[in-house]
Protein backbone atom coordinates (compact mmCIF):
# COMPACT_ATOMS: atom_id res chain seq x y z
CA UNK A 1 0.00 0.00 0.00
CA UNK A 2 1.29 3.45 -0.94
CA UNK A 3 0.34 6.65 0.87
CA UNK A 4 0.52 10.34 -0.05
CA UNK A 5 3.29 12.37 1.61
CA UNK A 6 2.41 13.41 5.16
CA UNK A 7 -0.90 11.55 4.90
CA UNK A 8 -2.87 11.58 8.16
CA UNK A 9 -5.92 9.26 8.05
CA UNK A 10 -7.38 11.04 11.08
CA UNK A 11 -7.51 14.36 9.24
CA UNK A 12 -8.42 13.62 5.64
CA UNK A 13 -9.65 10.94 3.26
CA UNK A 14 -7.83 10.57 -0.04
CA UNK A 15 -9.08 9.05 -3.28
CA UNK A 16 -7.89 5.50 -3.86
CA UNK A 17 -6.47 3.31 -6.61
CA UNK A 18 -6.10 -0.46 -6.71
CA UNK A 19 -4.31 -2.15 -9.63
CA UNK A 20 -4.09 -5.85 -10.54
CA UNK A 21 -1.02 -7.08 -12.39
CA UNK A 22 -1.08 -9.03 -15.64
CA UNK A 23 0.44 -12.41 -16.43
CA UNK A 24 -2.07 -14.49 -18.41
CA UNK A 25 -3.95 -15.45 -15.21
CA UNK A 26 -1.06 -17.76 -14.24
CA UNK A 27 1.88 -15.45 -13.48
CA UNK A 28 3.00 -11.89 -13.07
CA UNK A 29 4.10 -9.86 -10.10
CA UNK A 30 2.99 -7.11 -7.76
CA UNK A 31 6.07 -5.23 -8.94
CA UNK A 32 4.43 -4.40 -12.28
CA UNK A 33 2.47 -1.47 -10.87
CA UNK A 34 4.71 -0.33 -8.03
CA UNK A 35 5.92 2.68 -10.01
CA UNK A 36 2.33 3.58 -10.90
CA UNK A 37 1.20 3.26 -7.29
CA UNK A 38 4.16 5.24 -5.98
CA UNK A 39 3.48 7.94 -8.55
CA UNK A 40 -0.21 8.34 -7.80
CA UNK A 41 0.48 8.23 -4.07
CA UNK A 42 2.85 11.15 -4.58
CA UNK A 43 -0.04 12.92 -6.30
CA UNK A 44 -2.42 12.38 -3.39
CA UNK A 45 -4.02 8.94 -3.70
CA UNK A 46 -3.92 5.91 -1.40
CA UNK A 47 -2.80 3.15 -3.77
CA UNK A 48 -2.46 -0.62 -3.70
CA UNK A 49 -1.23 -3.26 -6.09
CA UNK A 50 -3.02 -6.52 -5.43
CA UNK A 51 -2.35 -10.20 -6.08
CA UNK A 52 -4.62 -13.16 -6.75
CA UNK A 53 -4.29 -16.93 -6.97
CA UNK A 54 -2.43 -18.01 -10.10
CA UNK A 55 -3.23 -21.67 -10.66
CA UNK A 56 -1.28 -24.02 -12.88
CA UNK A 57 -3.17 -26.11 -15.43
CA UNK A 58 -2.85 -29.10 -13.12
CA UNK A 59 -4.24 -27.13 -10.18
CA UNK A 60 -7.06 -25.73 -12.29
CA UNK A 61 -8.13 -29.24 -13.30
CA UNK A 62 -8.62 -30.10 -9.62
CA UNK A 63 -11.07 -27.26 -9.02
CA UNK A 64 -14.63 -28.27 -8.11
CA UNK A 65 -17.49 -27.83 -10.60
CA UNK A 66 -18.44 -24.20 -11.14
CA UNK A 67 -14.90 -22.93 -10.68
CA UNK A 68 -12.13 -22.20 -13.18
CA UNK A 69 -8.77 -20.48 -13.20
CA UNK A 70 -10.23 -17.15 -14.34
CA UNK A 71 -13.22 -17.41 -12.01
CA UNK A 72 -10.88 -17.90 -9.05
CA UNK A 73 -8.91 -14.80 -10.07
CA UNK A 74 -12.10 -12.72 -10.19
CA UNK A 75 -13.19 -13.98 -6.77
CA UNK A 76 -9.82 -13.06 -5.28
CA UNK A 77 -9.96 -9.60 -6.83
CA UNK A 78 -13.38 -9.03 -5.29
CA UNK A 79 -11.94 -10.00 -1.90
CA UNK A 80 -8.98 -7.64 -2.32
CA UNK A 81 -11.23 -4.71 -3.25
CA UNK A 82 -13.57 -5.38 -0.34
CA UNK A 83 -10.64 -5.61 2.08
CA UNK A 84 -9.25 -2.30 0.80
CA UNK A 85 -12.62 -0.60 1.28
CA UNK A 86 -13.14 -2.17 4.72
CA UNK A 87 -9.84 -0.63 5.84
CA UNK A 88 -10.82 2.80 4.48
CA UNK A 89 -10.89 4.56 7.85
CA UNK A 90 -7.52 3.19 8.95
CA UNK A 91 -5.95 3.94 5.57
CA UNK A 92 -7.44 7.40 5.21
CA UNK A 93 -9.19 6.29 2.03
CA UNK A 94 -12.44 7.66 0.66
CA UNK A 95 -14.23 4.44 -0.41
CA UNK A 96 -16.56 6.41 -2.68
CA UNK A 97 -13.60 7.68 -4.74
CA UNK A 98 -11.88 4.42 -5.62
CA UNK A 99 -10.42 3.76 -9.08
CA UNK A 100 -10.00 0.09 -10.01
CA UNK A 101 -7.94 -1.30 -12.86
CA UNK A 102 -4.99 -3.32 -14.03
CA UNK A 103 -2.98 -4.57 -16.96
CA UNK A 104 -3.83 -7.36 -19.41
CA UNK A 105 -5.28 -10.24 -17.35
CA UNK A 106 -5.40 -7.87 -14.38
CA UNK A 107 -7.60 -5.46 -16.33
CA UNK A 108 -9.94 -8.33 -17.25
CA UNK A 109 -10.07 -9.42 -13.61
CA UNK A 110 -10.75 -5.88 -12.39
CA UNK A 111 -13.61 -5.50 -14.86
CA UNK A 112 -15.36 -8.73 -13.86
CA UNK A 113 -14.72 -8.17 -10.16
CA UNK A 114 -16.79 -5.01 -10.30
CA UNK A 115 -19.29 -5.68 -13.10
CA UNK A 116 -20.26 -9.30 -12.36
CA UNK A 117 -22.43 -9.52 -9.22
CA UNK A 118 -21.59 -13.18 -8.58
CA UNK A 119 -18.29 -15.09 -8.09
CA UNK A 120 -18.10 -13.75 -4.53
CA UNK A 121 -16.18 -15.44 -1.73
CA UNK A 122 -18.90 -16.45 0.76
CA UNK A 123 -16.56 -15.46 3.59
CA UNK A 124 -16.52 -11.84 2.40
CA UNK A 125 -19.01 -9.21 3.63
CA UNK A 126 -21.45 -9.01 0.75
CA UNK A 127 -22.72 -5.62 1.86
CA UNK A 128 -19.40 -3.97 0.91
CA UNK A 129 -20.05 -2.54 -2.55
CA UNK A 130 -17.18 -2.66 -5.00
CA UNK A 131 -18.35 -0.29 -7.72
CA UNK A 132 -15.48 2.04 -8.68
CA UNK A 133 -15.61 5.72 -9.49
CA UNK A 134 -13.57 4.94 -12.64
CA UNK A 135 -11.73 2.16 -14.46
CA UNK A 136 -8.07 2.28 -15.56
CA UNK A 137 -7.25 -0.50 -18.04
CA UNK A 138 -3.86 -1.13 -19.63
CA UNK A 139 -4.29 -3.38 -22.70
CA UNK A 140 -7.15 -5.39 -21.14
CA UNK A 141 -7.11 -9.07 -22.11
CA UNK A 142 -10.70 -9.54 -23.25
CA UNK A 143 -10.93 -12.77 -25.23
CA UNK A 144 -13.69 -13.97 -27.61
CA UNK A 145 -13.19 -17.39 -25.99
CA UNK A 146 -14.63 -15.98 -22.77
CA UNK A 147 -18.05 -16.18 -24.43
CA UNK A 148 -17.93 -19.90 -23.55
CA UNK A 149 -18.27 -18.95 -19.87
CA UNK A 150 -20.76 -16.15 -19.23
CA UNK A 151 -19.33 -15.47 -15.77
CA UNK A 152 -15.99 -14.29 -17.17
CA UNK A 153 -17.23 -12.69 -20.39
CA UNK A 154 -16.98 -8.92 -19.99
CA UNK A 155 -19.47 -8.29 -22.80
CA UNK A 156 -22.18 -10.11 -20.82
CA UNK A 157 -21.73 -7.80 -17.85
CA UNK A 158 -21.45 -4.34 -19.41
CA UNK A 159 -23.92 -1.88 -17.92
CA UNK A 160 -25.35 1.37 -19.20
CA UNK A 161 -24.18 3.10 -16.03
CA UNK A 162 -20.53 2.13 -16.48
CA UNK A 163 -18.16 4.51 -14.69
CA UNK A 164 -15.71 6.62 -16.72
CA UNK A 165 -13.09 4.34 -18.26
CA UNK A 166 -9.57 5.00 -19.56
CA UNK A 167 -7.97 2.39 -21.83
CA UNK A 168 -4.46 2.09 -23.30
CA UNK A 169 -3.47 -0.18 -26.19
CA UNK A 170 -0.73 -0.61 -28.76
CA UNK A 171 -2.04 -1.00 -32.30
CA UNK A 172 0.18 -4.09 -32.80
CA UNK A 173 -1.26 -5.85 -29.75
CA UNK A 174 -3.08 -9.10 -30.71
CA UNK A 175 -5.39 -8.58 -27.72
CA UNK A 176 -6.72 -5.35 -29.24
CA UNK A 177 -9.32 -7.31 -31.23
CA UNK A 178 -10.94 -8.35 -27.96
CA UNK A 179 -11.05 -4.75 -26.78
CA UNK A 180 -12.47 -3.63 -30.13
CA UNK A 181 -15.34 -6.10 -29.72
CA UNK A 182 -16.04 -4.94 -26.16
CA UNK A 183 -15.82 -1.30 -27.22
CA UNK A 184 -18.27 -1.92 -30.08
CA UNK A 185 -20.70 -3.44 -27.58
CA UNK A 186 -20.24 -0.42 -25.32
CA UNK A 187 -21.03 1.94 -28.19
CA UNK A 188 -24.15 -0.08 -29.06
CA UNK A 189 -25.26 0.36 -25.45
CA UNK A 190 -24.50 4.10 -25.67
CA UNK A 191 -21.79 3.81 -23.03
CA UNK A 192 -19.89 6.94 -23.95
CA UNK A 193 -17.76 7.69 -20.89
CA UNK A 194 -14.79 5.88 -22.43
CA UNK A 195 -11.44 7.39 -23.34
CA UNK A 196 -8.87 5.30 -25.16
CA UNK A 197 -5.30 5.90 -26.27
CA UNK A 198 -3.88 3.78 -29.09
CA UNK A 199 -0.09 3.89 -29.43
CA UNK A 200 1.16 3.41 -32.98
CA UNK A 201 3.61 0.57 -33.59
CA UNK A 202 3.40 -0.82 -30.05
CA UNK A 203 2.67 -4.36 -28.87
CA UNK A 204 1.29 -5.88 -25.68
CA UNK A 205 2.70 -4.44 -22.46
CA UNK A 206 4.24 -1.37 -24.07
CA UNK A 207 3.17 0.75 -21.09
CA UNK A 208 5.65 -1.05 -18.81
CA UNK A 209 8.62 0.67 -20.45
CA UNK A 210 9.71 4.23 -21.10
CA UNK A 211 8.81 6.56 -22.64
CA UNK A 212 5.35 5.00 -22.52
CA UNK A 213 5.24 4.43 -18.78
CA UNK A 214 5.47 8.17 -18.29
CA UNK A 215 3.08 9.10 -21.10
CA UNK A 216 0.39 6.63 -19.98
CA UNK A 217 0.62 7.56 -16.30
CA UNK A 218 0.52 11.25 -17.13
CA UNK A 219 -2.54 10.66 -19.33
CA UNK A 220 -4.16 8.79 -16.43
CA UNK A 221 -3.21 11.68 -14.13
CA UNK A 222 -5.02 14.16 -16.37
CA UNK A 223 -8.01 11.77 -16.58
CA UNK A 224 -8.18 11.64 -12.77
CA UNK A 225 -7.90 15.42 -12.60
CA UNK A 226 -10.85 15.83 -14.96
CA UNK A 227 -12.84 13.56 -12.63
CA UNK A 228 -11.94 15.76 -9.67
CA UNK A 229 -9.75 13.13 -8.00
CA UNK A 230 -6.45 15.02 -8.38
CA UNK A 231 -5.35 18.62 -8.68
CA UNK A 232 -2.58 20.30 -10.62
CA UNK A 233 -0.33 19.10 -13.40
CA UNK A 234 1.40 15.70 -13.72
CA UNK A 235 4.82 15.46 -12.08
CA UNK A 236 7.96 13.40 -12.60
CA UNK A 237 7.69 9.67 -11.97
CA UNK A 238 9.60 8.19 -9.02
CA UNK A 239 12.82 6.38 -9.83
CA UNK A 240 12.84 2.60 -9.85
Show where each model-derived region lies.
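Short beta-strand-to-loop junctions in surface cap/lid or active-site-entrance loops
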Residues: 1-12, 91, 154-159
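Short beta-strand element of the alpha/beta-hydrolase
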Residues: 11-23
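Short amphipathic alpha-helix adjacent to the substrate-entry channel of hydrolases
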Residues: 30-50
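Alpha/beta-hydrolase active-site loop
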Residues: 66-90, 218
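Primarily recognizes the serine-hydrolase "nucleophile elbow" in alpha/beta-hydrolase
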Residues: 79-160
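Acidic catalytic loop of the alpha/beta-hydrolase fold
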Residues: 144, 171-177
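Short beta-strand/loop motif that positions the catalytic acidic residue
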Residues: 161, 166-169
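C-terminal catalytic histidine-bearing segment of alpha/beta-hydrolase fold enzymes
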Residues: 180-183, 187-240
Amino acid sequence: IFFPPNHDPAKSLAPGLILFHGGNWVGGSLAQFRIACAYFASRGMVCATANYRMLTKAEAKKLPPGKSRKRVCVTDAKSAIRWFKQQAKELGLDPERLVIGGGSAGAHISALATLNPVLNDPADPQDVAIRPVAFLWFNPAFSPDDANDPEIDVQRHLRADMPPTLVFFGDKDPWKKGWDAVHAKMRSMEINAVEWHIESGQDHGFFNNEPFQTTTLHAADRFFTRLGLLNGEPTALPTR
